[in-house]
């Protein structure tokens, strides 16, 4: 989770969600990444390196298997092809959750890991990571819960 240490000093992070997500995914951009640029990257399909970069932050077991089948990742890497739009969107959704949690916990890797991997009552006993990995609605449920926490509502 060393990649999350940047969240300890928020002034060092990109100022936009798109920029932070781009950083989590290791996206290279000539200018600061905005919403349109990020959407274009995802629509074209992210490079295999995006999955590898996110794996450095979360651990391989959180990305390879639950988000992208290992065989798919291996084929894309061997053929030097981009990931499919579906796989790219999965990486994006989990990155949104990781960004939100990392901002809330200011890069505290232990707290981030506990939050992501502990079952939560507001998620019907599922972990935030399971919800984020499931689909975009699951990721949105976690983000909404985090917004409540930021607004000082009990979660």
Question: Where is each model-derived feature located?
Answer:
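Non-transmembrane "mature" sequence context
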Residues: 1-155
């Amino acid at each position: 989770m060393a990649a999350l240490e940047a969240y300890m000093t928020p002034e060092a992070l990109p100022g936009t969600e798109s920029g932070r997500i781009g950083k989590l995914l290791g996206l290279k951009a000539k200018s600061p990444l905005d919403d349109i640029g990020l959407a274009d990257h995802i629509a074209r399909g992210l490079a295999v390196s995006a999955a590898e970069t996110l794996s450095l932050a979360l651990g391989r077991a959180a990305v390879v298997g639950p988000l992208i089948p290992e065989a798919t990742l291996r084929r894309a890497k061997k053929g030097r092809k981009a990931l499919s739009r579906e796989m790219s969107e999965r990486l994006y959704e989990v990155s949104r959750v990781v960004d939100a949690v990392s901002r809330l916990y200011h890069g505290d890797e232990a707290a981030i890991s506990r939050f992501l991997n502990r079952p939560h009552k507001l998620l019907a006993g599922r972990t935030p990571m399971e919800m984020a990995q499931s689909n975009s609605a699951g990721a949105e449920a976690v983000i909404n819960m985090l917004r409540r926490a930021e607004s000082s509502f009990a979660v």
